[in-house]
Protein backbone atom coordinates (compact mmCIF):
# COMPACT_ATOMS: atom_id res chain seq x y z
CA UNK A 1 0.00 0.00 0.00
CA UNK A 2 2.78 2.39 0.90
CA UNK A 3 4.53 1.85 -2.43
CA UNK A 4 1.34 2.96 -4.20
CA UNK A 5 1.26 6.09 -2.04
CA UNK A 6 4.93 6.69 -2.78
CA UNK A 7 4.28 6.28 -6.51
CA UNK A 8 1.43 8.80 -6.37
CA UNK A 9 3.64 11.20 -4.43
CA UNK A 10 6.24 10.97 -7.21
CA UNK A 11 3.50 11.62 -9.77
CA UNK A 12 2.68 14.86 -7.93
CA UNK A 13 6.36 15.83 -7.83
CA UNK A 14 6.74 15.18 -11.56
CA UNK A 15 3.81 17.51 -12.31
CA UNK A 16 5.78 20.33 -10.69
CA UNK A 17 9.33 19.36 -11.63
CA UNK A 18 10.39 17.18 -14.57
CA UNK A 19 12.16 14.30 -12.86
CA UNK A 20 15.27 12.61 -14.27
CA UNK A 21 14.42 8.88 -14.60
CA UNK A 22 17.14 7.96 -12.07
CA UNK A 23 15.80 10.47 -9.55
CA UNK A 24 12.25 9.23 -9.99
CA UNK A 25 13.35 5.63 -9.54
CA UNK A 26 15.30 6.57 -6.40
CA UNK A 27 12.35 8.50 -4.93
CA UNK A 28 10.00 5.59 -5.60
CA UNK A 29 12.45 3.15 -3.98
CA UNK A 30 12.53 4.94 -0.62
CA UNK A 31 9.38 5.05 1.52
CA UNK A 32 9.22 8.53 3.03
CA UNK A 33 7.03 7.26 5.86
CA UNK A 34 10.04 5.53 7.43
CA UNK A 35 11.66 8.93 8.07
CA UNK A 36 8.59 10.81 9.33
CA UNK A 37 7.91 11.15 13.09
CA UNK A 38 4.91 9.13 14.31
CA UNK A 39 2.54 12.10 14.83
CA UNK A 40 2.93 13.05 11.16
CA UNK A 41 2.78 9.62 9.49
CA UNK A 42 -0.54 10.50 7.80
CA UNK A 43 1.26 13.40 6.07
CA UNK A 44 4.20 11.26 4.93
CA UNK A 45 3.21 11.19 1.25
CA UNK A 46 2.21 14.83 0.93
CA UNK A 47 4.64 17.37 -0.51
CA UNK A 48 4.94 19.19 2.82
CA UNK A 49 8.05 19.68 4.92
CA UNK A 50 7.36 18.13 8.33
CA UNK A 51 8.60 18.99 11.81
CA UNK A 52 11.07 16.73 13.62
CA UNK A 53 12.73 17.17 16.99
CA UNK A 54 15.35 19.83 17.83
CA UNK A 55 13.56 22.49 15.74
CA UNK A 56 14.52 20.66 12.54
CA UNK A 57 12.44 19.56 9.55
CA UNK A 58 12.28 16.67 7.13
CA UNK A 59 12.34 18.40 3.76
CA UNK A 60 9.49 18.30 1.30
CA UNK A 61 9.95 15.34 -1.08
CA UNK A 62 9.74 17.87 -3.91
CA UNK A 63 12.77 19.66 -2.42
CA UNK A 64 14.63 16.36 -1.96
CA UNK A 65 13.99 15.45 -5.60
CA UNK A 66 15.13 18.87 -6.82
CA UNK A 67 18.30 18.94 -4.70
CA UNK A 68 19.19 15.44 -5.89
CA UNK A 69 18.70 16.34 -9.55
CA UNK A 70 20.56 19.65 -9.19
CA UNK A 71 23.70 17.61 -8.37
CA UNK A 72 23.89 16.48 -12.03
CA UNK A 73 23.89 12.80 -11.18
CA UNK A 74 25.23 11.08 -14.30
CA UNK A 75 28.65 9.39 -14.14
CA UNK A 76 29.33 10.11 -10.46
CA UNK A 77 30.46 7.87 -7.60
CA UNK A 78 30.52 9.69 -4.26
CA UNK A 79 28.54 12.43 -2.52
CA UNK A 80 28.95 14.19 0.82
CA UNK A 81 25.82 15.60 2.46
CA UNK A 82 26.02 18.35 5.07
CA UNK A 83 23.04 17.96 7.39
CA UNK A 84 21.70 14.40 7.54
CA UNK A 85 18.55 15.27 9.51
CA UNK A 86 16.07 12.40 9.25
CA UNK A 87 18.26 10.54 6.75
CA UNK A 88 15.68 10.77 3.95
CA UNK A 89 17.85 12.75 1.54
CA UNK A 90 20.80 10.41 2.14
CA UNK A 91 18.56 7.39 1.51
CA UNK A 92 17.43 8.79 -1.83
CA UNK A 93 21.03 9.57 -2.78
CA UNK A 94 21.99 5.98 -1.91
CA UNK A 95 19.91 4.73 -4.84
CA UNK A 96 22.00 6.80 -7.28
CA UNK A 97 25.50 7.12 -5.82
CA UNK A 98 27.75 4.17 -5.02
CA UNK A 99 29.01 5.88 -1.84
CA UNK A 100 27.06 8.37 0.30
CA UNK A 101 28.57 10.18 3.27
CA UNK A 102 26.36 12.31 5.50
CA UNK A 103 27.21 14.46 8.53
CA UNK A 104 24.79 15.44 11.32
CA UNK A 105 25.63 17.86 14.15
CA UNK A 106 22.67 17.00 16.43
CA UNK A 107 23.41 13.72 18.18
CA UNK A 108 19.80 12.61 18.70
CA UNK A 109 19.04 13.09 14.98
CA UNK A 110 22.27 11.29 14.04
CA UNK A 111 21.34 8.26 16.17
CA UNK A 112 17.83 8.03 14.70
CA UNK A 113 18.96 8.55 11.11
CA UNK A 114 21.69 5.93 11.37
CA UNK A 115 19.18 3.42 12.77
CA UNK A 116 16.67 4.08 9.98
CA UNK A 117 19.31 3.70 7.29
CA UNK A 118 20.62 0.50 8.88
CA UNK A 119 17.09 -0.92 9.16
CA UNK A 120 16.59 -0.31 5.44
CA UNK A 121 19.86 -2.12 4.70
CA UNK A 122 21.42 0.90 2.98
CA UNK A 123 24.99 -0.24 3.50
CA UNK A 124 26.46 2.33 1.10
CA UNK A 125 25.42 5.23 3.37
CA UNK A 126 27.90 6.30 6.04
CA UNK A 127 26.74 8.75 8.72
CA UNK A 128 28.97 10.74 11.07
CA UNK A 129 28.18 12.82 14.17
CA UNK A 130 30.28 15.94 13.67
CA UNK A 131 30.38 19.59 12.63
CA UNK A 132 29.49 19.55 8.93
CA UNK A 133 31.46 22.72 8.26
CA UNK A 134 34.64 20.66 8.64
CA UNK A 135 33.56 18.03 6.15
CA UNK A 136 34.76 14.42 6.24
CA UNK A 137 38.36 14.44 5.12
CA UNK A 138 38.89 10.70 5.50
CA UNK A 139 36.98 9.82 2.32
CA UNK A 140 37.69 12.95 0.26
CA UNK A 141 37.69 14.00 -2.49
CA UNK A 142 33.98 13.77 -3.32
CA UNK A 143 32.41 14.05 -6.77
CA UNK A 144 29.49 15.98 -5.30
CA UNK A 145 28.73 17.88 -2.08
CA UNK A 146 25.18 18.73 -1.04
CA UNK A 147 24.13 21.12 1.70
CA UNK A 148 20.80 20.21 3.28
CA UNK A 149 20.90 23.41 5.34
CA UNK A 150 21.42 27.05 4.39
CA UNK A 151 24.96 28.45 4.50
CA UNK A 152 26.18 32.05 4.53
CA UNK A 153 29.33 30.90 2.75
CA UNK A 154 31.09 27.66 1.81
CA UNK A 155 33.90 26.71 4.23
CA UNK A 156 37.33 26.23 2.68
CA UNK A 157 37.52 22.73 4.18
CA UNK A 158 34.62 21.64 1.98
CA UNK A 159 36.04 23.28 -1.12
CA UNK A 160 39.26 21.36 -0.47
CA UNK A 161 37.32 18.09 -0.16
CA UNK A 162 35.49 18.52 -3.48
CA UNK A 163 37.02 16.87 -6.54
CA UNK A 164 38.39 19.24 -9.18
CA UNK A 165 35.53 19.63 -11.65
CA UNK A 166 33.10 18.47 -8.98
CA UNK A 167 29.77 20.09 -8.19
CA UNK A 168 28.52 21.54 -4.91
CA UNK A 169 24.85 22.46 -4.42
CA UNK A 170 23.84 24.62 -1.47
CA UNK A 171 21.13 26.96 -0.24
CA UNK A 172 22.92 30.28 0.31
CA UNK A 173 21.78 33.18 2.48
CA UNK A 174 21.84 36.43 0.50
CA UNK A 175 20.59 39.49 2.35
CA UNK A 176 17.03 38.62 3.41
CA UNK A 177 16.48 35.60 1.19
CA UNK A 178 17.84 32.14 0.47
CA UNK A 179 18.74 30.87 -3.00
CA UNK A 180 19.93 27.47 -4.15
CA UNK A 181 23.19 27.74 -6.06
CA UNK A 182 25.16 25.18 -8.01
CA UNK A 183 28.92 25.64 -7.89
CA UNK A 184 31.66 23.91 -9.86
CA UNK A 185 35.25 23.60 -8.64
CA UNK A 186 37.78 24.99 -11.11
CA UNK A 187 41.44 25.65 -10.36
CA UNK A 188 40.87 24.87 -6.68
CA UNK A 189 38.13 27.51 -6.33
CA UNK A 190 34.34 27.47 -6.49
CA UNK A 191 32.60 29.20 -9.36
CA UNK A 192 28.84 29.75 -9.42
CA UNK A 193 27.53 27.67 -12.32
CA UNK A 194 23.86 28.50 -11.85
CA UNK A 195 21.45 30.18 -9.45
CA UNK A 196 18.59 27.68 -9.37
CA UNK A 197 15.72 29.02 -7.26
CA UNK A 198 14.65 30.70 -4.04
CA UNK A 199 14.23 28.40 -1.06
CA UNK A 200 13.76 28.11 2.70
CA UNK A 201 16.07 25.84 4.74
CA UNK A 202 17.15 25.76 8.37
CA UNK A 203 20.56 27.44 8.79
CA UNK A 204 23.94 25.74 8.99
CA UNK A 205 25.20 26.02 12.59
CA UNK A 206 28.76 25.60 13.86
CA UNK A 207 29.64 22.88 16.36
CA UNK A 208 27.63 19.91 17.64
CA UNK A 209 24.87 19.40 20.18
Swiss-Prot record:
Any one GO BP annotation for this protein: protein modification process
Catalysis: reaction(s): [protein]-L-isoaspartate + S-adenosyl-L-methionine = [protein]-L-isoaspartate alpha-methyl ester + S-adenosyl-L-homocysteine
Transmembrane residue ranges: none
One GO CC term, this protein: cytoplasm
Main location class: cytoplasm
Quaternary assembly: Monomer.
Function statement: Catalyzes the methyl esterification of L-isoaspartyl residues in peptides and proteins that result from spontaneous decomposition of normal L-aspartyl and L-asparaginyl residues. It plays a role in the repair and/or degradation of damaged proteins.
Protein name from the UniProt record: Protein-L-isoaspartate O-methyltransferase
Recorded name of the encoding gene: pcm
